[in-house]
Structure formats: structure tokens, C-alpha cells
């Protein structure tokens, strides 16, 4: 319907009326723009910002948590093991009901792998306390006692490893993760829970692998076949920062209480 027919219909009390059938008189009253209407309802902050005023966030808008830099060495705990042929980004972080948490990183992270491995979040948080202890200058093995035999095993070959040169975090194994949408929350949610890496036979998309890297996570590859670790195992990754800086393409890992193997 054209604009005049809409006007004719409105003038005819809502009865559908074509413009050429309207029997009334067309008038064009004078129009005067009143900017006060907008000045009273719309805030224009250009040139009038006050830096001393603290921004008030809504209850579901949260800042990103602090994220430590990559340490010289890493201790990773496998907290989820997924053997499906493909793991989608929607399985890594569901859509739908989680959309209201997009401005709340920690709130959104509570849904990570909830449809695939509901215990993942709890296990990742248990490991994260060790890294938080390191950032506070405390002993990670005191915060997470199960690390004591892990450090003992590491010290048999790397006696100089301590809280000053090691990071502790979680990792997951998936055969082929990252298929589907480009949502970066599939990686960021793991990161805010203390994730430091993914281990996979291959990555479903370049964009998921890139998202891992962008969020400071290591996209490890391992050949297909029997895994040299299981869910709950610890993996020691020595001199990982040096390897990243030198763009190394292959690496070795040490599983606590076991021997070295290629990763």
C-alpha cells in the first residue's frame, strides 16, 4: 500500500481506502521541527563526558577475568576426553539459553561442554585453583595437593621446575573439534576456566584453531590411534614458551609417572 492510501485509510477510521477513492479533502499542515522532544529523551555525550563518573554495569555484564601469560613450562591436566568423530562448536558452548550470558564471560563458561561432558566445568575449576595460587605467589601443590606426586615425577628429569617458571591448567582431547559456527566463545569459555590447550587428531576448521590461538591456548595435534594419556592424567610440557617463540612444529610431552612420548 502506498503512503497516500495509508493516510486515506487512517482518515477513514481504519477502513481500507485507496488514495484515489478518498472523498475527503487533502491538507498539508505546516510542520515545525521541535528538537526539544529529542533533547529531553536522548542523551548526547559528545564533548560532555565526565571521566570521574564510574560506569554502572547491569547485573549480568561482567569484566573479563585476568588471564596470565604463558609460562616457560606447563603442567596440563586432561579434564575431558571426547571420541566422537566430530565435536561441534555448539557442543563446546551451546547456543540458545546461553545467549543472555554473552556479556558475562564467567557466567557463560558455566555452560561449557554441558551437553557433551557435564562434569567438565567442575574438573576445570579444580585445576584452575593451582594457577591462581601461582599468580598470588603461593605454592600450586598446596592449593591442589594432587600435584605433589606430579611435581615429584617431573623433578626426576627437570629438578628446577617450580612456581616461578611453570603454569598449571586444563586441556581437553577431542578427535576433531570446532565444526560449525565461528563463535569464539567455544575457545574463550575454556580459557576463562583455566584452559591452556586442546589436543586433537585434527581441527575441524581453521577458524576454531585460530580462536584457540587468539585466546592464548595451544592447539596441539596428536596422531590417530591409542592415546598416551587418559582423562585425569597430567601432561608436562617443558620449555613451551620457547617453542612458541621459535615457532616449533613438533614437541614432546611427559606424562606424570610415565615416559616421554611425541605429542
State what each model feature region is.
Residues 176-179, 202-206, 226:
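Acidic, glycine-rich active-site loops and adjacent beta-strand->loop/helix elements
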Residues 196-201, 219-222:
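Short hydrophobic alpha-helical runs that function as membrane-insertion/retention elements
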Residues 209-251:
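A structural-propensity feature for long, helix-poor, extended segments
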Residues 252-259:
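Conserved small/polar residues in nucleotide/adenosyl-binding loops
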Residues 41-197:
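Non-catalytic terminal/interface segments that mediate subunit docking, oligomerization
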Residues 1-36:
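Mobile "lid/hinge" segments at catalytic clefts and subdomain interfaces of large enzymes
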